[in-house]
Amino acid sequence: MTALNWKPFIYGGLASITAECGTFPIDLTKTRLQVQGQPNDAKYKEIRYRGMMHAIVRIWREEGVKALYSGIAPAMLRQASYGTIKIGTYQSLKRLFVDCPEDETLVLNAFCGVLSGVVSSCIANPTDVLKIRMQAQGNVMQGGMIVNFINIYQQEGTRGLWKGVSLTAQRAAIVVGVELPVYDITKKHLILSGLMGDTVYTHFLSSFTCGLAGALASNPVDVVRTRMMNQRSIRDASNSSYKGTLDCLLQTWKNEGFFALYKGFWPNWLRLGPWNIIFFITYEQLKKLNL
């Protein structure tokens, strides 16, 4: 067992922030698409956007280009905490069990990914709640990040900042438990097969593959998580559209059909794909720094 290495924590946070800034407008359209069409919520009952590109154009025209970056501050803060802990914990857990990357297995990496995803997402949940509120409600939410943090706390209490934490942890367990192992195993086999070396092209192909796998696995829980986090009035259950995560899942399926659970899939994949490509290429380049 080797000593704790600080580099994966720092590099993971920096690469996560870089990837978040590069793909944020796509993430915002995903959120808008996922919260619309809820028959039991008058505010989000209307189908305002026909797809990702239509959403981007309409938001730009009606709310301005700055609206495409609504929630970017808490998103960056989230990645500074979530991304740092996620990658650092994942890499540290792997080295706890095996000393050499060649000895890693898919099962081991998946276990480490699930655990690191749960821990990091629980810690970063308040920033995720604020990011989704600011994305979904756009210019309706007045003030900056700190003001809105305080407003959520005053109106909904501490529980409001950790609303949807179980779903966030479930989604993180799925995403991290799929993406990081798929990336590592794909990269490992490409290199060991002799088809490709440890180059940026290998990193690109591996990150593209893990982004697709993560989007397919996580989209249903992402839809439910987004709707639960965007729901308000936690202190007055009678005003809540959904009684819990299972109720949200069942109501969405019943009222809108099974494929409603894959609302926002294309922007989800089109975000996870580029996000992972930017993240892993940045991370791999940072690893090469002689620090």
From Swiss-Prot:
One of its GO terms (biological process) is inorganic anion transport. InterPro entries: Mit_carrier (IPR002067), Mito_Metabolite_Transporter (IPR050391), Mitochondrial_sb/sol_carrier (IPR018108), Mt_carrier_dom_sf (IPR023395). It catalyses: sulfite(in) + sulfate(out) = sulfite(out) + sulfate(in); thiosulfate(in) + sulfate(out) = thiosulfate(out) + sulfate(in); sulfate(out) + phosphate(in) = sulfate(in) + phosphate(out); oxalate(in) + sulfate(out) = oxalate(out) + sulfate(in). Pfam families: Mito_carr. The chain crosses the membrane at residues 9-26, 71-89, 106-124, 164-183, 204-224, 264-283. It is a multi-pass membrane protein. This is Kidney mitochondrial carrier protein 1. The gene is slc25a30.
